[in-house]
Regions:
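Short, structured surface patches at the beginning of a domain
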Residues: 1-163
């Protein structure tokens, strides 16, 4: 997908009007029962969400189960998704929110920029950010910074027994 051409097209239509190869990325950090239910629901939801759009073709599910979001190199499905994006197999990745994709601002920006270089946008659905939008990087930086700080606070609470 040509990002600049697509941005021009989106001035007169929505992302739902585009013919796209769409995948989703989901991640939970533990294998607790609650998180397993969450990952199952995310899987089901995104498969249905993508299938309901007649212009989109579902091309893959990338699910990292029971893996921390701090280090992307330890997330096999994330790495497979990046390789498939580079190979031109994906136009858009849908994910629940920024914290599922990356746990720090630098990784959020690094990987979304890399994906855009491959012609792939990322839609952080709950955060209402799609990297195909021209102003997305500013909003992504702000929201990623907030998410990173929340992660730091939670880590400190756990460390001191206040979680």
């Amino acid at each position: 997908m040509n990002v600049y051409r697509t941005r021009e097209i989106l001035k007169t239509c929505s992302v739902f009007d585009l013919k796209l190869k769409v995948a989703f990325y989901a991640r939970v950090s533990t294998e607790s029962e609650d998180q397993q239910v969450s990952i199952h629901h995310q899987d089901e939801y995104y498969r249905n969400f993508i299938a309901q759009n007649k212009n989109w073709v579902f091309v893959g599910a990338y699910i990292d189960n029971g893996i921390s979001g701090i280090r992307t190199e330890k997330r096999d499905e994330f790495q497979r998704m990046m390789a498939d994006a580079k190979a031109g197999k994906i136009d858009m990745i849908v994910t629940k929110e920024i914290t599922r994709f990356a746990r720090n601002t630098l990784d959020s920006i690094k990987y979304t920029r890399e994906l855009l270089m491959y012609g792939v946008c990322v839609w952080f659905q709950n955060d209402n950010i799609n990297t195909i939008d021209e102003d997305s990087e500013l909003r992504l930086t702000i929201m990623s910074g907030i998410a990173q700080d929340e992660s730091r606070k939670l880590s400190n609470r756990i460390k001191f027994g206040h979680a």
